[in-house]
A protein has these predicted regions:
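Chalcogenol-based redox active-site neighborhoods
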Residues: 1-156
Length: 156
């Protein structure tokens, strides 16, 4: 898992695709100072590849890590992937919308929205998964979960 790079630091990461992830990233960015003050780091994970995540970070002046989930490896490992049904895929393709194109793979699977609070060992202590995660993963919820972790003391 991505947080194991720095085993002494808890982290908050958010996962998703398209418009949802862009809104979630902006919300996570707004919480980043509080998350850092709690001794953790904020990470966003998107299946988008190429320059898109980097450009989004630059254009919105975001101060957090944005990582690409190539081939949905992280999302699959957490069971956070849904397969796009043929009855939805076909009309989208007829309109010229190929949801797999920005991801760099040909299969039509999308990550489910999720926000996790992980401790310094990479163990999940709070999970907000699915459509409700948009309203559940508030700054207050995340900070409350971080305050319950046994880990580094909050930064002054």
């Amino acid at each position: 898992m991505v947080c194991r790079d720095k085993p002494s630091e808890p982290c908050v990461w958010t996962n998703g695709d398209g418009l949802w992830i862009r809104g979630a990233i902006r919300a996570l960015h707004g919480s980043t100072p509080s998350i850092r003050a709690a001794g953790a780091r904020a990470i966003a994970i998107t299946p988008e590849t190429g320059d898109s995540p980097r450009n989004f970070k630059r254009d919105h002046r975001l101060d957090l890590e944005i990582l690409s989930d190539l081939d949905l490896g992280v999302s699959l490992s957490f069971g956070l992937v849904s397969v796009m049904p043929a009855e939805i895929k076909s009309p989208l393709l007829q309109r010229g919308l190929d949801l797999s194109a920005p991801h760099g793979f040909s299969f039509w699977m999308l990550p489910m929205p999720a926000t996790y609070v992980l401790d310094q060992r990479g163990i999940i202590h709070r999970a907000c998964v699915g459509p409700d995660s948009i309203t559940e993963a508030t700054t207050e919820t995340v900070l409350a979960a971080l305050s319950e972790l046994d880990g580094p003391q909050p930064r002054p």
